[in-house]
Regions:
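N-terminal alpha-helical signal peptides/signal-anchor transmembrane segments
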Residues: 50-76
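Soluble extracytoplasmic domains of inner/organellar membrane proteins
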Residues: 82-83, 89-196
Length: 196
């Protein structure tokens, strides 16, 4: 009798087990879909934030670039005057510092949102921030050189101003390269429809 009961109940039990299995698999698939959607939304927010940061950094560079070009020209005039033996007195040879941010990029990396970005976008943005890091290191070195220049200006003003001209010149060259990378990357992202 128990075998007969088992035979009758077996299809019901198998159907119930299949429905439970299907329900569990459906729930897991729905959870995976939701998590994937959340990750993609995070990556999209991170990308928009990074693009806004790059735009802001570009504006900062545009401002400081003009000022540093003017300062470089003024420093070259001062150097020419000093080399010609004319006293320039208290010549103002200075440097405008660009305050660039990488907070959005660092946040995108720490939140692991970059894992869900298109590989080419991630590579392009990595290049932007790599060059920005180089620029910031060169800028810090230029600030150090300018500080040293002020310290040694009384002993050898020609050498001090020459060092200032070199520092500003190197920074200005790298400045142009960084702006070009910013613009190219932004243009590419907009053209491909990744951002507005």
């Amino acid at each position: 009798m128990s075998t007969n009961l088992m035979r009758r109940k077996l299809p019901e039990l198998l159907l119930e087990a299949a429905m439970i299995f299907f329900a569990v698999m459906l729930a897991l698939a729905a959870e995976e879909w939701r998590e994937n959607r959340d990750r993609l939304e995070l990556a999209d927010r991170a990308l928009r934030s990074v693009v806004e940061e790059v735009r802001s950094n570009l504006e900062e560079l545009e401002t400081t670039g003009v000022r540093n070009a003017e300062r470089l020209e003024a420093a070259r005039v001062v150097l020419a005057e000093l080399e010609a033996g004319r006293d320039e007195g208290d010549a103002d040879v200075g440097l405008e510092v660009a305050l660039l941010s990488s907070a959005a990029w660092q946040s995108a990396q720490m939140s692991q949102a970059v894992q869900y970005l298109d590989f080419d976008i991630m590579r392009d943005l990595s290049e932007v921030y790599e060059i920005q890091d180089l620029y910031e290191r060169v800028q810090a070195g230029a600030v150090d050189n300018m500080t040293e220049m002020m310290r040694t200006a009384e002993q050898d003003p020609v050498a001090a101003v020459r060092q200032g001209v070199i520092s500003i010149s190197v920074l200005t060259d790298l400045h142009g390269s960084l702006m070009e990378v910013y613009r190219d990357t932004l243009e590419k992202l907009v053209a491909e429809g990744d951002v507005r």
